Amino acid sequence: YKGGSRNNSLINKKMIFRVLGVLLFIESAMFLLCAAVSLCYGEQDYQYFLYTILLNTLVGGVLLICSRGAENRLTRRDGYCIVTFTWFLFTLFGMLPFYFSGGIPSVTDAFFETMSGFTTTGATILDDIESLSHGLLFWRSLTQWIGGLGIVFFTIAVLPIFGGGTIQLFSAEAIGVTHDKTHPRIDVMAKWLWMIYAILTIAETVLLMIGGMSFFDAVCHSFSTTATGGYSTKQASVAYWNSPFIEYVIAIFMILSGINFSLYFMCLKGKGKRLFQDDEFRWFMKSVSILTLVITFALVFQNHYDWEKAFRRALFQVATAHTSCGFATDDYNLWPSFTWMLLIFAMLSGGCTGSTSGGIKNMRLMILARNIKNEFKRMLHPRAVLPVRVNRQVISPSIIASVNTFFVFYLFCILAGWILLMFFGVGIIEAMSTVISSLGNVGPGLGAFGPAFSWAALPDAAKWILSFLMLIGPVSYT
């Protein structure tokens, strides 16, 4: 080993403890906000948030004490450890208000619901959402907004005070294959992205209130939409309002949240043309448009919807599937069966890199498709030099290899999860759809766990397996 190389290969435990400790204090501040919401509505659930704050700050304080003397450095390995343990700890403490209050009396169900929130999956075990207090409903939606914030939350809330570790944790949370050299420093970029995230949330809140939602419902649904999570304050989800205006607003903001946020930054810099020149953006919009058009025709000619309703329902469901959001306005189990395959394709594809959406990401699909195309060309022209290009940039062989490895890993997770769920008694279709939904952080599945049903009927073992897949999703997709 060269000098220091052995030490550099080790995990910086004290630095990890410090970051996790600070993040737990930030989560406590979020709990305090939810307690204030409960007090505003005259509800007693505020006390359960206070109990959780005490436990949270106690553990956070212990972690900070254990971090004394930490070296001011973070490696990529440290970054992945922080991201993974943050999801787990936030979920572990985030479930406590649900459990303490009796709103979700089962540890398994409370953990599942909270993990689904922080990973922006949107699958729920609740059969009577409206029975929860306003404070718990607000916390439920806030978990998604925090989870959707992802990279921006970690970067601007914690890392600037730790100096050189920013890049490493950024790369553990960020998703992309290239870095534009025209972009500013990562911490500056993160602040701009946070502003964009907040602006989208506020803009949608205003529009939903114009459409007839209360302020509370509008805020909660805006949290879920911009995070592409899908938690609603109503059991019937967005269909509760039966409002075309609200459906169009949410559909549009789901699509906006599925676009690479750095492209919005370029637009703010006066480089709006970059948006329409971006290969991934065009791929994403073409996919949304084609799927919406095909499903619209299917609903008109096979389900006898009128044209406007067919287009609206198709657009909404394609948007929610393609951006891994969990909202629903229709039971697509009643649609033509071939449309299920189209929606599953949208679930697998996900949104753009650098967005709040889950799924495989369109960038990876583009690289895979273009590499396959080149391989077929090489069969005819063995000596041809055929680089894979994205946005006119040549993608390195190492990135292509990592994309291929990712797909193998992804398929392995689907197969393993599918087999395990069937072992515990879940049906073939339901097992496949819930595994794909959890791994892609999508939300509703098919069959008995479609948009019209909760996931409460799943065996406890299946819920723990799916919770683990939800956690793998945001970590592996990076």
Regions found by a protein language model. Give the residues of each.
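Membrane-proximal intracellular helices of multi-pass ion channels
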Residues: Y1-Y477
